[in-house]
Amino acid sequence: AHPVTGAKIKQQVMKGKKLIVLDPVTTELARLADYHIKLRPGTNVAVLNMMLHFIIKNKLHNADFVRDRTEGFDNFIKEIERQDVDELARVAGVDKQLVKEAAIAYATAKNSMEFHGLGVTEQEQGSKTVMLIADLAMITGNIGRKGVGVNPLRGQNNVQGAADMGCQPHQGAGYFEVADEKNQKFYTEKYGVTHPTKAGLKIPQMFEAAINKELKGLWIIGEDIVQTDPNSAHV
């Protein structure tokens, strides 16, 4: 889904960086991993709780970062410590020792980064999974500085960059609504050209407009709309 990011990760692995992959499937990236945690689909929360448990139990959290930059850590510890790691391992179908080693590797590295795609977010426990990923980064101090962080990857190639730069029908660069007169004035003064005063068509609306002969052309860059969008026959 993200070949450029994947290539960058592979390059770092070839330079000796350790790679942890949580994936039910043995992908090309998983084959390069030092720790491939082949969890059952839908058990991300269980495995992440295991990792948090091992980090806390081995006192590998960043005490200074936790004290200065987080809240509610005492309650967090109580919640993590009450987890039954053996039961979590059984539910996820993973090797407890492998998860422990991966957790220690993540916590003890000078810098640790995390990347996840729609396989994490577009599932029943997606929100909880992302929260636990953020918890991992925070308790180890792997956020807010160069070479660390949580990196969510969006669904299509460069959709994040396109949105950041204002390639959206309803927002300009910086995510300001184009229908707002204050934002229109800002954009017009910034770019020296008159800015649109109303939102354009979103993708599903474009299809309807094309059918109604209101849309004369569509410039498609880097996306297969027939495969990507719902109802291929309609598209």
Enumerate the predicted regions with their spans:
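Cofactor-pocket helix-loop regions in the catalytic cores of large enzyme subunits
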Residues: 1-158, 184-235
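Surface-exposed loop and adjacent secondary-structure segments within mature catalytic domains
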Residues: 158, 165-174
